Amino acid sequence: MSSLSTKTDLLGDPDFIRLQSVEVDGSEVIPGETRPRRNTKFPKLTNSPDGKTFTLYDVYRINKDSDSNFLGIRELLADGKRGDYKWISYKQACIRANNIGSALVQLGLNKGDRIGIFSINRPEWVLSDMAAMNHSLVPVALYATLGANAIEYVVNHSEISVLLCEGKNVEKILSMPGTTIKTIVSYDPLPQATLDKFKDNENVKLYLLSDFEKLGEQNPAQHEVPSPEDLCTLLYTSGSTGNPKGVMLTHTNMVSEVAGANFSPAGVIPEDVHMSYLPLAHSFERAVVSLMCYVGGQIGFFSGLIPELFNDIQVLRPTFLCGAPRVWQRLHDKLWFTVNNDSWLKKFLFNWGLNSKQSALRLGSTTPIWDKLVFSKTKDRLGGRVKFILSGSAPLDPKLAEFLRACFCCPVVSGYGLSENVGGASVAYPEDNNVGHVGPPLSACEMKLIDVPEMNYFSTDKPCPRGEVCIRGFNVFKGYFKDPEKTKEDLKEDGWFHTGDIGRWNENGTLSIIDRKKNIFKLSQGEYVAAEYLESVFVRSPFASQVFVYGDSLNSFLVGVVVPDFEVVQKLFASKYPELDVSNHATLAKSKELYKEILSSFDACAAEAKLHGFEKLKHIYVEHEPFTEENNLLTPSFKPKRPQLKERYQTIIDTLYAEYKRDHPDV
């Protein structure tokens, strides 16, 4: 196969790839901890991308006179379909943001006051954020899929008086008469029924955005320029327990993240195009959008429906893509589904090409002939211009990363971060052909590991230290809004943020996220179980789309809830079990055949991952309805809400345990 493979230099700086982070010179040796590590290329932490940009206000103003495309959305055609992207320039955006900001001042808002933004990603979201920066206001983002109770909590907790939102959310706010909101600005025209409700509402004033911009244009206000340490935004975490926490991020936090990303492999140039679909209420997407603003790139927004995302991608043709592992897993599954429905010859060529290319990539080679014969078509699924894929929010399966890298002809890098550090603390370098890690620290922060003895993770582990990941630097948050106790718990006086994630320093100075401190539980025999890791193993099954693993200290074994990948199931079962009605998901989920196939595939996954016996699922419930944000079982970053999952399936879990104990009295 040498004729199909060409050796190329993918290692960049070989010395750096061999050692990507180093211990901080002069740092104290503390028992139970590793010494702090920084990016080898940045022994001094950075808080600005250029030494003169220190606030998000500065970031938004850099390209204020540019006529280049900035914000784009697909035009809605007369027949209800979506057309091409329609753009506004940086100059146009700054003019509109000036008007919106002046109108906010006209309402009596002052520096430090909070405003709300309640919308899916769209140009008006960014314009509202820009307007807030012009006058040192503090935007508070509400998730489009938050429940009424959470929305009301965030609004009142942050004392929002003015809310800018898309039209469909206006009714939701009106149904909450006890909030602090005094003014609503709707991005969209409203039906007469909604307008009539405002006639009788003396407590809340309504503006349409077009009228609001005219108000500001007629009453221009001087900018109130923020300082680097001023509060820039409140990001309420989508956490899986209790009320959301308000993460206080300063301008220094936001801009140092721009610097860290700009100096990283995720750095972009003015010619780059970003597809914005991850929630702007999430710190990661805010950071990416801020980075694009800094370099003067283009930001295209999805049409609002995740099922249409890949159609939007093919129209926009972005130059890089960001997403969570669940997005990439679905892309993987859909591609395999297409391959398995092709002719035997195309299937044979795809498998041959995939195996050959993956082997070549591990050796630092490329396969131009295979790319032309097979993978040019798969690359076109993402628009044909994607130069790298960035995965975050959860660990990416190394096998999935290799698959994506081969099929889409670009590096696939994993990043790591939380809301408390603006979504990014580390990111892998595309020149590093190793997978299964999240790279070295960004230039804005340093990281260390501390012992977690109850899980047998120690900073003295050989050959690689392991422990809880702690982060300190310019991108680490100021604290939780109105919650000093939680702040003291997670953010120590010496500036170290304790993440609750378990990491491992690899020999080349990269970090791997291997576990989660807060999502472990002990079985009755004393064995600890890491639920998230096991879920990542079992979801490798071709039959599984989503998996919820459950265990507790009263039982010696695990049970689970599984949402099948019905596309795969229908294809395989149509020939193997012709007597089953594969078109009815609810009926199919109850079939013994599917139950047995899933458990059998889980056993294979467990064997491949070398799981212990107590880590295997003994009994499962097959659920035909997926876990989603809408049914409150997923966070906006696609992480499972474990307490809500437990509450929803508690009766089923109890039944699973009772049935298995009945049939296996010796457990």
Curated annotation (Swiss-Prot):
It catalyses: a long-chain fatty acid + ATP + CoA = a long-chain fatty acyl-CoA + AMP + diphosphate. Its EC number is 6.2.1.3. GO terms for cellular component: cytoplasm; cytoplasmic side of endosome membrane; endoplasmic reticulum; lipid droplet; membrane; phagocytic vesicle. It is an enzyme of class 6 (ligase). It is found in: Endosome membrane. GO terms for molecular function: ATP binding; long-chain fatty acid-CoA ligase activity. It is a peripheral membrane protein. SUPFAM superfamilies: Acetyl-CoA synthetase-like. The keyword Isomerase does not apply. One of its GO terms (biological process) is fatty acid metabolic process. It comes from the Eukaryota. CDD domains: LC-FACS_euk. It holds the Pfam family AMP-binding. Keywords: ATP-binding, Endosome, Fatty acid metabolism, Ligase, Lipid metabolism, Membrane, Nucleotide-binding. PANTHER family: AMP-BINDING DOMAIN-CONTAINING PROTEIN-RELATED, LONG-CHAIN-FATTY-ACID--COA LIGASE. Belongs to the ATP-dependent AMP-binding enzyme family. Long chain fatty acid acyl-CoA synthetases catalyze the formation of a thiester bond between a free fatty acid and coenzyme A during fatty acid metabolic process. May mediate fatty acid retrieval from the lumen of endosomes into the cytoplasm. This is Fatty acyl-CoA synthetase A. The gene is fcsA.
